[in-house]
Amino acid sequence: GNFSFTTINLPKLALEAKGDLGKFWELYDYYIDLCHDYLLDRLKIIEEKHIYNYPFLMGQGVWLDSEKASPVDSIKEVLKHASYSIGFCGLAECLVALIGKHHGESEEAQKLGLEIVGHMRERTDAYTEAEHRNWSTFGTPAESTAGQFQRANKRVYGTIPGVTDRSYMTNSSHVPVYY
């Protein structure tokens, strides 16, 4: 199963970059690293828990190899089968903030959107290779997060047409429903 995931607010990075693609990529890499490190820190804490701390997940054999462990064993060995995901939200608004159009409106935006998602995938694939853990890129289905991120962006950057002018941003890589 998925151990945990965290989500990057893509429009925030685009707004911080102020249309500068070089700055956007720099911020994007920084936040991908931050998410990676956060998930590893969380793993260090959780893997010290025991099978008995998770009676349903571990006791019912839901996780691979949990059936081989005794109740007092650490869940560390079981967690080696888990996935660790870095997600994203608001690709459409990110693209509007960077180049003025989203991926449903122009080929240039679609190409850049694919590069943004592809870059995260390359980074998570590199983590998988280096650490022998199951890292993945996750298009976050984030109804509540999309609203929270949008409110935070609007509070900091104000109302920006196509970026912060709605009560929520798009989930993951969706084309806006209003388009």
Predicted regions and their residues:
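Extended amphipathic alpha-helical segments enriched in small hydrophobics
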Residues: I86-L95
